[in-house]
Amino acid sequence: MSHQPLSCLTEKGDSPSESTGNGPPHLAHPNLDTFTPEELLQQMKELLTENHQLKEAMKLNNQAMKGRFEELSAWTEKQKEERQFFETQSKEAKERLMALSHENEKLKEELGKLKGKSERSSEDPTGDSRLPRAEAEQEKDQLRTQVTRLQAEKADLLGIVSELQLKLNSSGSSEDSFVEIRMAEGEAEGSVKEIKHSPGPTRTVSIGTSRSAEGAKNYLEHEELTVSQLLLCLREGNQKVERLEIALKEAKERVSDFEKKASNRSEIETQTEGSTEKENEEEKGPETVGSEVEALNLQVTSLFKELQEAHTKLSEAELMKKRLQEKCQALERKNSATPSELNEKQELVYTNKKLELQVESMLSEIKMEQAKTEDEKSKLAMLQLTHNKLLQEHNHALKTIEELTRKESEKVDRAVLKELSEKLELAEKALASKQLQMDEMKQTIAKQEEDLETMTVLRAQMEVYCSDFHAERAAREKIHEEKEQLALQLAVLLKENDAFEDGGRQSLMEMQSRHGARTSDPDQQAYLVQRGTEDRDWQQQRNIPIHSCPKCGEVLPDIDTLQIHVMDCII
């Protein structure tokens, strides 16, 4: 895992299955038969320990970066609070300026009053002292000059306050500007290199910054060094693999060169042997041939030694290559078996890079805010100095005004005293007249209270009378309803009686017609006729209703007229 380059990982976290992480793609994987299982177990344990160490280092780095980010957020909150404090101070300065302007206006009014009084005193013939007037005029001139100075300083302060407001508004928009930068892993590594090797403002520490900012920067540099050390370890592993591959290629090239040289030497030896035979046959100098053969033998032995060294280097390189390939295979198996760990590692790397970029942006923003706060502090110091000067001048002006008022109070005219005495007399007279009016009003109020008490009693009596009248009216209505019911019953009974009488008469007439001889007595007929007339008079008397007033006894024809009469009569 430590020797595998970061560029071999894809964006989704999967490792390519066709090509290995190290070495050229055309070379075949070594056989696992060359290694014992103990060596394989040791290598697997080493890889697991390295992987675990890398995980712990990444977790610690993430935790440290998170803590640093929280510290930076707290520091930004402190900066915001300081900015709010500066804003409140600027508001207080504005309020003080407004108060000073109001006081200046009051001073102007007092100056106008003093001018009017001085003119009055100059018009009066009683003024016999000229020196105090000259002193008063000099003091007035001094006050005028002080007022002009105060107005000029007020204008300057207003300009400074407006500039501060503009700067605060412009800086407030860039407080929460935070940009997330997403980029490929290769570009992220390049940005990390630039951050490490750049001599820019990220590493420099200004002299005027506070201790907290310096400690934060040192902590950040330490975290950047830890990340850079991890990246350097990974790169060194990759460079070692590349160096071994290059050494393998060079050794192979040397072997091929040595083989070519050996073949050439063998051909040369055969040629030299043929030439020696010819020379022996021709009997040419045997000593020169022996020396050449010895030299060739020495060259061949040196070449064989070089070949053996190259073979040993090749075997060592092949062993290293086999080990690395086995590690790569184990890592590929592990990656294929646990893709979630790869995703976690990629996420950790991505979060680390993202946090580094965020820290850089936060540092740049912090430096900008520090510069702004320093400018604001300097301007606030200037404002405080000007404010103190204004307060001193204002106090001096107040003292001069108090002295002038004391002098004028000592020079009070008699006319003013007379006017005040006349005003007092008029006020006493007005008070006496108002006191009389108050007494009269109190008497009228007492009478009205007595009238109100009598009115309450009368209202209570009226309510009682009204309740009695309504009760009597309801009783009379009930009696009238009962009378009407009785009249209806009477009418029904009279109709029944008339019907019975008619039936009786008819029966009598029938009986008379049947028994005419028996009923020839005239006295009995007269009695019957008289009885019928009496019954009719009684019925007429019963049908006439009596409507009379209970108070005056007046008889009325209807119940409605009786109700109206009763209301008028009782009230």
From Swiss-Prot:
Binding site for Zn(2+): 549, 552, 565, 569
Record's protein name: Optineurin
Source organism of the structure: Macaca fascicularis (Crab-eating macaque)
Gene: OPTN
GO terms for biological process, alphabetical: autophagy; cellular response to unfolded protein; Golgi ribbon formation; protein localization to Golgi apparatus; regulation of canonical NF-kappaB signal transduction
Keyword Coiled coil listed: yes
Ranges of compositional bias, category Polar residues: 201-210
InterPro entries: CC2-LZ_dom, NEMO_N, NEMO_ZF, Optineurin/NFkB_EssMod
UniProt motif LIR: location: 176-181
Matches recorded under Pfam families: CC2-LZ, NEMO, zf_C2H2_10
Coiled coil: 38-170, 233-502
Record remark: domains: The LIR (LC3-interacting region) motif mediates the interaction with ATG8 family proteins.
PTM annotation, UniProt: Phosphorylated by TBK1, leading to restrict bacterial proliferation in case of infection.
